[in-house]
From Swiss-Prot:
The gene is gap1. The record marks 180 as: Activates thiol group during catalysis. The keyword Cytoplasm applies. PROSITE patterns: GAPDH. NAD(+) binds at residues 12-13, 35, 79, 314. Belongs to the glyceraldehyde-3-phosphate dehydrogenase family. It comes from the Bacteria. The lineage of its organism: Bacteria, Bacillati, Actinomycetota, Actinomycetes, Kitasatosporales. This is Glyceraldehyde-3-phosphate dehydrogenase 1.
Length: 333
């Protein structure tokens, strides 16, 4: 069965999701996108990407549609998600990637329009279920869960890092810092912003700011609820981020034991979600990788303190998790 997908919001994540689906999934079909931008601009930004390069097929704009190779994708321009004709288009799952409709009550408008399920590409409020693949996807219940949050890009990396370490040696408490690429929420030049640090020029500064990843961990790993705290350092790179997790463990361990746990996870149950690397990487090395990467060489143990580091492409990796999640949900429709 081919699962029919609608994308609401054709920005960085929406276009990355489109590319990820085109690159690797014959089980999913993108049938429509909704965005208030004009069609020629949307087609151009899909065809030419500053990070991912040229789209591998010809992309052209048509009246009310984008043509990609021999496929035609309908383009809608509705402000109100409840007015979208998902039912008429036969859409099974909507990927909500505007960053606006993160409240489940608003996202549910897609269901009112005929979609069967909604995946919110962000942390959400009031959702039926928040999922990090490899951590709690086994708890997904198609009968009870209609509005599903895919958490954040950082939570997807942190969740796997924390789960593997917690299963191996037990986590008592910890701190996480994500050194994160700048995003559209920041300013190109100094300008007003509700977060006065994010008000500063993104390409010129290291910008300390908040991260909701620690709170979200409690949703996907309830045994760690309230045990982790976190913040972010936004840095002047366009994509490619790294999570530094430092914890107090419940028992003594060694660098070798920690590495062995991650090596086993990467070659076993987390294959495709987590890779194990010994090479001395920098951020550009992981751009375009769909998995999070455990950097074995940065592992440290000092008494009861353990530090582990995981890289992730905050755009491409997260978009691939959205495709994985849509495939999982689609398998039980």
């Amino acid at each position: 069965m081919t699962v029919r997908i609608g994308i609401n919001g054709f920005g960085r994540i929406g276009r990355n999701v489109f590319r990820a689906a085109a690159a690797r999934s014959s089980e999913l079909e993108i049938v429509a996108v909704n965005d208030l931008g004009d069609v020629p601009t949307m087609a151009h930004l899909l065809a030419y990407d500053s990070i991912l390069g040229r789209f591998p097929e010809e992309v052209t704009a048509e009246p009310g549609a984008i043509r990609v190779g021999d496929r035609t994708i309908k383009v809608l321009a509705e402000r109100d998600p409840g007015a979208l004709p998902w039912g008429d288009l036969g859409v099974d799952i909507v990927i909500e990637s505007t960053g606006i409709f993160t409240d489940a009550a608003k996202a549910r408008s897609h269901v009112d329009g005929g979609a069967k399920k909604v995946i919110i590409a962000a942390p959400a409020s009031g959702e039926d279920f928040t999922v990090v693949l490899g951590v709690n996807d086994g708890d997904y219940d198609p009968e009870r869960h209609t509005i599903i949050s895919n958490a954040s890009c950082t939570t997807n990396c942190l969740g796997v890092l924390a789960k593997v370490l917690h299963d191996a040696v037990g986590i008592d408490s910890g701190m996480m810092t994500t050194v994160h690429a700048y995003t559209q929420d920041q300013n190109l030049q100094d300008a007003p912003h509700k977060d006065l640090r994010r008000a500063r020029a993104a390409a010129l500064n290291i910008v300390p700011t908040s991260s909701g990843a620690a709170k979200a961990i409690g949703l996907v790993l309830p045994e760690l609820a309230g045990r982790l705290d976190a913040f972010a350092l936004r840095v002047p790179v366009p994509t490619g981020s790294v999570t530094d997790l430092t914890v107090t463990t419940r028992r003594g361990t060694s660098v070798e034991e920690v590495k062995e746990a991650y090596a086993a996870a990467a070659s076993g149950p987390y294959k495709g979600l987590l890779s194990y690397v010994d090479a001395p990487l920098v951020s550009t090395d992981i751009v375009g990788d769909p998995a999070s990467l455990f950097d074995a060489g940065l592992t440290r143990v000092c008494g009861p303190q353990v530090k582990v580091v995981g890289w992730y492409d905050n755009e491409w990796g997260y978009s691939n998790r959205l495709i994985d999640l849509a495939t999982l949900i689609g398998s039980s429709l």
